[in-house]
Amino acid sequence: MVEKKSPAEGWPVVNGDYIVGDPESPVAATTLASHIEDVPVEAGAAIAGPCKTENLGIEKMIANLISNPNIRFLILCGSEVQGHITGQSIEALHQNGVDPDKRNIIGATGAIPYIENIPDEGIERFQKQLEIVNLIDVEDADAIKAKVKECIEKDPGAFEEEAMVIKVEEGGEEEEGEEVKPVAPETALIEARMRNIQTQVKMIGSTNRMFAGMYSGKVQGIMIGLAFTLTLGILLLV
């Protein structure tokens, strides 16, 4: 038997639109934009529910996951959230973390991928405790249930550290039973293009500075060569 630990008192610690199963299960599932949370729980998941926003929604999810050290797998399934691109944002957060100053998820393509309520130690705990299983855009119940059972069979036991409890502000977004309207794909595309333009402007500036230095060096070399040639010519004439 693998080792199990007690979740934080009152787990799940953050309210939300989810279904709770066996708290000793090693599997959690986010169904992203789809309301098929009963499917993973029926197969043995500890908790399952949608996650519609790439900021507060992810923060709430992380708070509930790291407060239960028994959960070692996070299955991303259901339809991707248009505009928010929440599933990809979760993967990017797990792989890359956040910018320490701006708090944006590094590599996320969603419209507003910022993590402000989870400290660095909470993000590191999420990265170490959980393995991400990508079934994004998969809504087939049999496929999801099979993956849940596969993860249960690979249960490595509870994470070595005790439950970590982080308070997340719950006002405004994704309250229980509330639908969060997705950002229009056009808006998300504009946001992404603006970020790309900013990056390209910085690259162009660096390139211009480099070429300016090279040009300055070439001009200096030409002037030295010209002076040397003139001096040599005068000496030969004399």
From Swiss-Prot:
It holds the Pfam family MtrA. Residues 238 are extracellular. Residues 2-218 are cytoplasmic. Disulfide bonds: none annotated. The keyword rRNA-binding does not apply. Its cofactor is 5-hydroxybenzimidazolylcob(I)amide. Keywords: Cell membrane, Cobalt, Membrane, Methanogenesis, Methyltransferase, One-carbon metabolism, Transferase, Translocase, Transmembrane, Transmembrane helix. It is found in: Cell membrane. The complex is composed of 8 subunits; MtrA, MtrB, MtrC, MtrD, MtrE, MtrF, MtrG and MtrH. Belongs to the MtrA family. Part of a complex that catalyzes the formation of methyl-coenzyme M and tetrahydromethanopterin from coenzyme M and methyl-tetrahydromethanopterin. This is an energy-conserving, sodium-ion translocating step. This is Tetrahydromethanopterin S-methyltransferase subunit A 1.
